[in-house]
Amino acid sequence: MPTISTADFKNGLGLRIKDKVYTIVEFQHVKPGKGGAFVRYKTRDIKSGRVVENTCNAGTKFESVMLTTREFQYLYNDGADYIFMDNESYEQVPVPEDMVGENSKWLRENDICQLLFADDELMGVTPPMFIETTIVQTDPGFKGDTVQGSTKPATIETGAVIQVPMYLNEGEVIKVDTRDGKFVSRV
């Protein structure tokens, strides 16, 4: 396994610490007037998303991990797994439901998603940043429902419930930001 020293730290670099994969979020080399130099760093657990702050002596070695993101097309859910297809090799990859997690509410068949790999081990799924979807259920809007800032719940075709402006009705196509689940615009 390739190792990396604290002198080679960069934001976004992949590390394996105690059998977990992390990315470096932030780091700082500290050289106090008295005592040895050390490094203060923050890492994000790839699977859980938790951020952890640590310190270590300067020059400490860590196992490095090659993080790669590849485009896959979401095909379908077979009940237990989500099936994705590699756009280059046409290989189908089953992804367990617990690995997709909350992102499942943004997946539509044939959407292009990003799959994150750490040394060829699948670590996570990222849906497209924006999706264009249809409102399948919401309370009807009435003439004059254009008051700035007022919203109502709406169910979209993926099953997710989001807040939309009062003037939108069922059947309208909208653009949604999948990072925070917010309405962006009409399409």
Residue ranges and their predicted role:
Residues 2-157, 161-187:
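Acidic-enriched and Gly/Ser
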